[in-house]
Each structure stands twice: as structure tokens, then as C-alpha cells.
A protein has these predicted regions:
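Catalytic center-proximal scaffold of phosphoryl-transfer enzymes
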Residues: 1-266
């Protein structure tokens, strides 16, 4: 998420959002989000933030993440990438809304069928989700892949539709990751929803003003938005937490002050 650094907008900085939300499959870990402040959008920033993380990362199509999946990745093993079907759908929707393309309409219909299965299995265990996806979703995804290949052979790669189809094809491996692990979501909408409050807040807090201000913005936003997704009232949490720190809350028990552990006083 781009944030302005100076009033004349000649310099820009970014907040990168990293989120965890296992509620759709009944995970035990509470949801949370952290906004990392960085002076740019280059892939090395993501590499730094994710140093030590090994696993599956749900992302959009931004190419800066590509280095994370390479054997040469710094800070850990190559990350398994799960790409976002909502972004794939959005590409076709843009074409359909503009041109009324029948090809785009057919692609949208196929994606809608895949999403219908996700609606059916939301809230079930990872094993149940995986079984349903392998039995029901995998054939639909395979059919979409066949359809995608056929349309790319018919449509000029330089056309608007051709460019959108190429985008989907370029991310095809990552679009299939959700078929192999029941914990993986079909899209990255959860984290995108957590970026939206930052974008809205820019209208009220137009400028970070300084690198330290940007970093502080990210830290405070991390606490506030994590409160909100855990149904914790942010002001009550911040007030109680500051009071606890002022009263000498021990650093050895810092986890007690995380938003999901907050217990409001009666």
C-alpha cells in the first residue's frame, strides 16, 4: 500500500501487509496482520520481512515476490506460492465490462463454478476441504486450464483480452496451489480487506512526513486492525495496554498484551 512521504508527493513509501487468518478452516491460531514500512516496493523488502518463513504464501501477481520462490532465496527455503483467483477473475471482468466479450463471459462462468465449491466447504477442516477440492474443484480447474490454452491460441496476445489471458497463464501454477493443501484459500481477499482501512485512512492522514512516522503508522495500524479482526475494541485495548506498560508489565510476559489476549474490564 503506497503512502505519501512529503506533501508534494515527490517521494513515496509503502506499507506491506502480512496477514494470518485460519478461521475459514477452523485453525487454532488467532487472526492477525502486521504492516511493515519500507522505502520502496522492490522484492528485496518482501525477502527481508519474510526471512525465516518457510511455507505457503498467498499473494497477488506482483512480480517482486518471484524471488521468494527461487532456490537462491535469502532467508529460507523457496516459498510455495499460492496465487489469487480473485485477481484472475478481475482480469476477465474488466474485459467483459468494457467489451462484452463472450470469451471473458465464459471464463467468468467457469470461475464462478469453482467459487461455488469454496462456499460449500467454508468452515470445514483442512482435510475435508482438500478432499472436496480434489474431487470437485480439480476437474473444473483442469477444464479451465484447457479452455485457457485454447483461447490463447485464438486471441491475439497483443489485444486487451490476450494480455489478460496471458496474466492468468503466467500464474497458472500458483493458481493450482489451493488444490494441494486444505489450509490455503482460493484468493487473497482476506489480506486485501486488511489493506483497505490503510487506504481509507490516507484521506485523514495524508502524509507520513518521515521514515520514523511511516514505521510508527505501520506499528499502530497493526495493533488496531488486529484488534478489529479479533472483535476487540481498539481504543479500550490501547488504553489498557499503555496502562499495563506504565505499571511495569514484565517483558517476559509481552504475549499477554497481544490483541487476542485482551480481556476488557467489566
Amino acid at each position: 500500500m503506497k503512502i505519501a512521504w512529503t506533501p508534494d508527493l515527490t517521494v513515496a513509501r509503502y506499507l506491506w501487509a502480512l496477514a494470518r487468518d485460519d478461521r475459514n478452516w477452523g485453525g487454532d491460531d488467532p487472526p492477525g496482520v502486521v504492516y511493515f514500512y519500507a522505502p520502496g516496493r522492490h522484492g528485496e523488502h518482501a525477502e527481508t520481512f519474510l526471512s525465516g518463513f518457510n511455507g505457503i504464501l498467498q499473494i497477488d501477481g506482483y512480480p517482486g515476490y518471484n524471488r521468494l520462490a527461487r532456490p537462491s532465496r535469502k532467508g529460507g527455503d523457496p516459498i510455495v506460492v499460492a496465487h489469487c483467483w480473485a485477481h484472475a477473475r478481475r482480469k476477465l471482468k474488466e474485459i467483459f465490462d468494457r467489451d462484452g466479450s463472450e470469451i471473458a463471459a465464459e471464463g467468468l462462468h467457469q470461475i464462478t463454478e469453482i467459487y461455488a465449491i469454496e462456499k460449500d466447504i467454508r468452515g470445514t477442516s483442512p482435510g475435508q476441504r482438500l478432499s472436496a477440492r480434489q474431487a470437485r474443484s480439480a476437474p473444473l480447474v483442469a477444464a479451465f486450464g484447457t479452455w485457457l490454452h485454447a483461447q490463447r491460441g485464438r486471441v491475439s496476445p497483443k489485444s486487451r483480452l490476450g494480455e489478460k489471458l496471458a496474466y492468468i497463464a503466467n500464474h497458472w501454477d500458483g493458481l493450482q496451489t489451493f488444490l494441494t493443501d486444505g489450509r490455503v484459500e482460493i484468493d487473497s481477499n482476506n489480506v486485501e480487506n486488511l489493506v483497505r482501512p490503510i487506504a481509507l485512512n490516507r484521506k485523514n492522514a495524508l502524509f507520513a512526513g518521515h521514515d520514523e512516522g511511516g514505521a510508527a503508522w505501520g506499528r499502530l495500524a497493526s495493533l488496531v486492525e488486529t484488534c478489529k479482526i479479533n472483535n476487540v475494541e481498539p481504543f479500550a485495548y490501547l488504553k489498557s495496554t499503555h496502562e499495563a506498560i506504565a505499571a511495569g508489565h514484565p517483558k517476559s510476559r509481552i504475549d499477554d498484551l497481544l490483541p487476542w489476549n485482551f480481556q476488557p474490564s467489566s
